Amino acid sequence: MKTLRHINISDLHLSVYSEPTDYIDELMLIIDYIDKLKESIDVLTFAGDIFDRVYPANHKVIQIAVDFMTTIAERARLYDFKVFLLKGTLSHDNTQLDIFSSLESPNFHIVRNVEFIDVEGLLFRFIPEYYSNTYEELYEEALTTKADVTIYHGSIESAMPYAKALKADTHKMAQVIKDRDIIETTGIYTVCGHIHNRINIADNIWYTGSFSSHSFSDAGTKKGFDDITVDLDTGTFKVNFIENRYCRKYIILDGTDICKSTVKKMKAFFNDLKLDKKAKDIIRIDVDTNSYNDEEYKNLSFIMSSYKGIFQFKIERQVKTQEVKSIEEDAEYVLSPTIPLTHKIQKTIEEIYEVNLSVDRIKELLDISDIQKPTINDEIKEGVQVW
């Protein structure tokens, strides 16, 4: 049986970590896997969004990316496989893939525009995220020729419910490929980048998902890349998902019950959680405080300040009608142009410090004369100096 071995990696997003070097052990997972397969690999594709944002040339993310891709290019020459870097979203990759231009060779190619390339007898179609005024322009350039395999960065109609960043101007400009057009013009399979969830559009159309975790929307999901084997005799394929076991974990815990207990119990719980927490992982505690009394809410506030920087807290609290009314009344009082500043200060001091100062004493402290300065709506009368 003659086969083609295709590794697809999507949405690296170098670097979403505050410390870019945290990504190195994850990138080494890819290198180690290549070294394991060696000459059995035929093609390695990166399906867009190598970078998380645009970085200056001297940024350490750029250096990590160059070192990583240099290693990939060396392995491609050593084991004789093809590498294709597909340009992703404008706000992420932009023109930054050009920093890899010196690596380009018969084994290493940057795909900036729609291209059709033969790999081991299969026609690969590469479609970067496509920006145009009309869908017809995309269709004419990319979808009038049938391909065996399509590598695409962007949105497909059926994947739109999963797209999370469509409000961004760059995403509004990008075209969305219609399901029927990708189905009718791809013979074996289509694998996509751009959406970070791993989702199947059809049996032969799917999103690999991001290589690593990027936010709490990734909580509870596995990250990694695809190892695809194509039977060239039958045109069938199988996919083996390789998990990124080193990626950061975003963990969401329901803390409503534990955070209603005593400070002592909460400290014991969070201290144990702190000991079990890996350095890269981020844990969020979701707390519904609508049934909390004042003392319980106060205890929670103390715990939140005690573990600031270690855990994140998401608090759910419905503002009661009387609280809204009180806030509105306070706002009206503070913003009212008819109430003198001294009276506003008097009320604020009384509410916060429970001290009752007379208006005369406040004037004295502020060195205000008996002739009051005008309020906002006072008018300067002709011939009268009020300041």
Regions found by a protein language model. Name each.
Residues M1-I7, F116-F126, T144-V149, D203-I205, ...:
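Beta-strand-turn-beta hairpins that frame and shape the catalytic cleft
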Residues F84-L85, T89-R180, F211:
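Conserved catalytic scaffold of divalent metal-dependent phosphoesterases
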Residues K2, V230-W387:
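Accessory, non-catalytic peripheral segments of nucleic-acid enzymes
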Residues I34-K36, D118, Y135-T144, M266-L275:
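Short amphipathic alpha-helix with an adjacent loop that forms part of the alpha/beta core around
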Residues H6-N8, T45, F126, V149-H153, ...:
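Structural motif
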Residues S10-L14, D49-F51, T89-S91, P128-Y130, ...:
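Active-site metal-binding loops of divalent metal-dependent hydrolases
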Residues Y162-F237:
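Conserved beta-sheet core of the metallophosphoesterase superfamily
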Residues K2-R5, V16-D118, I183-G187:
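Core catalytic region of metal-dependent phosphoesterases/phosphodiesterases
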